Amino acid sequence: MSTYEGRWKTVKVEIEDGIAFVILNRPEKRNAMSPTLNREMIDVLETLEQDPAAGVLVLTGAGEAWTAGMDLKEYFREVDAGPEILQEKIRREASQWQWKLLRMYAKPTIAMVNGWCFGGGFSPLVACDLAICADEATFGLSEINWGIPPGNLVSKAMADTVGHRQSLYYIMTGKTFGGQKAAEMGLVNESVPLAQLREVTIELARNLLEKNPVVLRAAKHGFKRCRELTWEQNEDYLYAKLDQSRLLDTEGGREQGMKQFLDDKSIKPGLQAYKR
């Protein structure tokens, strides 16, 4: 179980069998993201990245919400009343964990969307490698309803995962949609009944824990970078990642996998990971 009890005010961390559950913990505010939460999440992510007990990170929310987005009072009204340099600091901290750290995180990440997911919550949702949501979850880009366009990297997140028409429809109308629609749109990998959400997420996390962590990191980073590069750049970059993973992999995953398949005949790599 967790060794982090009481360390952070707005975030809880529980580690179970290699899975680090990172729980946004402001249920009375539907886990709205405040400047304090943003600062604490930077520390949480950097701490867990170095913790060998945390093999896969699952991001979820306490109570009935994943996150309602940015805390309107703390993030906007109070920050807007301060100097411009304060606004810049607060925005930088928000982007640091919601996108920069999470998107290229060293370990696999899964968004476990248990309820409300609004506005700024779309950035960390898409930054996670994989996402499972509850059928009962409610998603919405409500910024237009209170007079601003989507902030942070919400529009970029939508553009990278959801088609042009669907993105603009929800950005411009502010209408909400449920878990099944989120899965249909490709915003999440799968939508399941809330009662099954944790079980399904744990099953996925255990699948990832079976994989070689060095190679898994190279594979996910390679995919995310390749979307930004030309074909020629990708050829060089992805071969470099392949060579890098072999150098960094102390357990010799490639050699182990080849041996178990070709020599020992003990695995079927099309159906399972090699035995670590």
Curated annotation (Swiss-Prot):
It is an enzyme of class 4 (lyase). Its EC number is 4.1.2.61. Changing residue 239 to F: Increased KM for feruloyl-CoA but retains a significant amount of catalytic activity with a kcat 10 times less than that of the wild-type. Keywords: Lyase. Optimum pH is 8.5-9.5. InterPro entries: ClpP/crotonase-like_dom_sf, Enoyl-CoA_hyd/isom_CS, Enoyl-CoA_hydra/iso, Enoyl-CoA_Hydratase/Isomerase. It catalyses: (E)-feruloyl-CoA + H2O = vanillin + acetyl-CoA; (E)-caffeoyl-CoA + H2O = 3,4-dihydroxybenzaldehyde + acetyl-CoA; (E)-4-coumaroyl-CoA + H2O = 4-hydroxybenzaldehyde + acetyl-CoA; (E)-feruloyl-CoA + H2O = 3-hydroxy-3-(4-hydroxy-3-methoxyphenyl)propanoyl-CoA. It comes from the Bacteria. The keyword Ubl conjugation does not apply. Changing residue 123 to A: Reduced kcat compared to wild-type but not markerdly. GO terms for molecular function: feruloyl-CoA hydratase/lyase activity. The keyword Transmembrane does not apply. Acetyl-CoA binds at residues 29, 68, 70, 72, 120, 142, 146. One of its GO terms (biological process) is isoprenoid catabolic process. Vanillin binds at residues 75, 151, 239. Belongs to the enoyl-CoA hydratase/isomerase family. Homohexamer; dimer of trimers. Catalyzes the hydration of the acyl-CoA thioester of ferulic acid and the subsequent retro-aldol cleavage of the hydrated intermediate to yield vanillin (4-hydroxy-3-methoxy-benzaldehyde). The enzyme is also active with caffeoyl-CoA and 4-coumaroyl-CoA producing 3,4-dihydroxybenzaldehyde and 4-hydroxybenzaldehyde, respectively. This is Hydroxycinnamoyl-CoA hydratase-lyase. It comes from Pseudomonas fluorescens.
